């Protein structure tokens, strides 16, 4: 209750801080009148709420558990989500091509998997960018495939070989996004969820704008059917990692504290319910014991 005590809850009515005996009597009488009216009307939803309010079910237990462990659950899921794409080239290298292809196909749903925008394992280089990226001292994608034209469908399906290595199942930017989002989640948990929410306008400036500029400015470079005045560019692996990390960290910084506010309300509500139900059960046991004497 954020220090606003004492607090008295009488049915749907809540009295905070200093309140008079009259206010308490009015709230109690109103709650009883409301209970009588709803019971007389035979409101089924009310009866269900009353029954649910004096019992603890599995959904309550799961909701309470999830409200406490949601950061670890989501961050662990994201960590596994980012690890699996790296298993694809490992499996391909070790001869388990069927398993590797399943991973490639599953992640194809969420990622373009363009060969010139992906990382590689077990090859001469960790990436093979397009010539348009103007990165000196690296083998380009065009040199690998032996063609100066870009076939997008072929680039998506291209996995690699023993010489250049095998492609990770998601692109460079997605690796940075999901990896940094998972990392921020673990950091948020280690700080006991005390990191304050990033304002939406800072999220927009820090997280969204850079990735939008870097990503959308590459679109003309995928086709030759653009006017001459349209700038043609290709981003670099470093820029993709930077903008992806900014988006992942910024989104986690904005999202997790906001989720914590909602989860905190859930924990308080359920903790109060558990306390009430336990008190009712103790009272019932005491009454039953005294009755049996």
Predicted regions and their residues:
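Non-catalytic, surface beta->alpha helical segment in thiol-disulfide oxidoreductase systems
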Residues: 9-40
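N-terminal signal-anchor transmembrane alpha helix
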Residues: 68-98
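Extracytosolic (periplasmic/ER-lumenal) interhelical loops and adjacent juxtamembrane/interface segments
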Residues: 93-170
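Interfacial helix-loop-helix junctions of multi-pass membrane proteins
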Residues: 163-167, 214-247
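Hydrophobic alpha-helical transmembrane segments
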Residues: 169-188
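Short, highly charged, low-complexity non-transmembrane loops/tails of multi-pass membrane proteins
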Residues: 263-292
């Amino acid at each position: 209750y954020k220090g606003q005590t004492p607090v008295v809850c009488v049915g749907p009515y809540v009295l905070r801080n200093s309140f008079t005996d009259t206010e308490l009597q009015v709230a109690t009488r109103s709650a009883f009148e409301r209970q009588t009216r709803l019971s007389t009307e035979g409101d089924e939803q009310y009866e269900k709420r009353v029954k649910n309010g004096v019992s603890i079910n599995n959904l309550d237990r799961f909701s309470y558990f999830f409200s406490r462990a949601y950061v670890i659950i989501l961050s662990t899921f994201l960590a596994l989500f980012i690890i699996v794409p790296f298993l694809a080239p490992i499996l391909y290298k070790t001869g388990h091509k069927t398993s590797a292809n399943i991973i490639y196909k599953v992640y194809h749903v969420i990622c373009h998997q363009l060969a010139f925008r992906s990382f590689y394992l077990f090859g001469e280089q960790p990436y093979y960018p397009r010539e348009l990226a103007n990165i000196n001292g690296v083998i380009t994608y065009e040199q690998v495939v032996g063609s100066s034209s870009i076939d997008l469908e072929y680039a998506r399906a291209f996995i690699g070989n023993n010489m250049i290595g095998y492609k990770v199942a998601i692109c460079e930017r997605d690796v940075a996004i999901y990896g940094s989002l998972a990392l921020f989640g673990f950091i948020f948990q280690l700080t006991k969820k005390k990191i304050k929410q990033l304002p939406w306008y800072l999220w927009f400036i820090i997280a969204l704008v850079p990735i939008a500029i870097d990503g959308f400015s590459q679109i003309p470079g995928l086709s030759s059917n653009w006017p001459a005045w349209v700038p043609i560019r290709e981003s670099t692996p470093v820029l993709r990692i930077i903008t992806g990390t900014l988006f992942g960290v910024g989104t986690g910084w904005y999202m997790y504290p906001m989720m914590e506010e909602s989860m905190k309300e859930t924990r308080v509500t359920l903790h109060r319910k558990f306390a009430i139900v336990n008190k009712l059960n103790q009272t019932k046991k005491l009454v039953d014991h005294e009755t049996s004497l």
